[in-house]
Amino acid sequence: GTVKSADGKYIPRDFNVSDPNYNQSWREQTMIGYELEHQFADNLTFRQNARYATIKQKYRYLVYANSAANSTVLTRRAQREERTTNEFGLDNQLEYLLETGSVNHTLLGGFDYKTSKDKQLLARGSGSQYDLDWTNPVYGVNVDESTFKTATDEQQNLDQMGLYLQDQMSWNNWEWLVSGRYDWSEVRTNDFTDNSFTQQNDNKFTWRTGLLYAFDSGLSPYISYSTSFEPNLQTNRAPGVAPFR
């Protein structure tokens, strides 16, 4: 809907700017993985988790582009999006239980690795045949995708590795957790609209801590603080423009 009127009228909130003849939302997702655990001793356990995933998406729709002042005719644009993502993740961790005086420790250390490949395609078509009068909408537009122009055609590859160490300490009704992690990442982007290539390498140390007191009544107030790191895979829509940083 609209807040301001156009020629004394308002676009209703349930108005469909797309078209039933060109409106597709399709997604297929496949995942496979495993969880492995081996106990070397009562206080020493090894775990390994792995997962592979494939996600395929296709979208077809019309979007609002612009309109003339005080006009009831909307200029629309037809768009087709296709995206395929392949991901693999592996996590190895070792858990060790020990006591130092009256304090119980649960130590957790590990190494994880993640790799992904993301292919994106966005094509657009425009023309007066997509115009729509919102005061008297007539749907059933015919879209010719052979006239589309490519707006985005790229492939991004991510490799990320991380080392982490955590200690969870228990003393009477107190629980204190402290952990640290260091990440390395590399993002490679191939922009096929202008045959350009960019690469971004980042590394970061992050940490977290939390303190909890468990009352006998079951109430457990806590306080925590954490930092995090996530590689940025987003890129600009404009062809040939370098990725966001």
Residue ranges and their predicted role:
Residues 1-39, 54-85, 130-151, 156, ...:
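Acidic/polar loop-and-plug regions of large Gram-negative outer-membrane beta-barrel proteins
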Residues 85, 104-108, 112-116, 154-245:
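Structural signature of Gram-negative outer-membrane beta-barrels, strongest in the C-terminal barrel
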Residues 35-51, 55-63, 214-217, 221-222, ...:
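Membrane-embedded beta-barrel scaffold of Gram-negative outer-membrane proteins
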Residues 1-8, 59-66, 120-126, 188-196, ...:
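Outer-membrane beta-barrel translocator domains and adjoining extracellular loop/strand segments
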Residues 32-38, 90-96, 163-169, 209-213:
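Residues on the lipid-exposed face of transmembrane beta-strands in outer-membrane beta-barrel proteins
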Residues 84-85, 89-163:
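C-terminal low-complexity, acidic/polar tails when present
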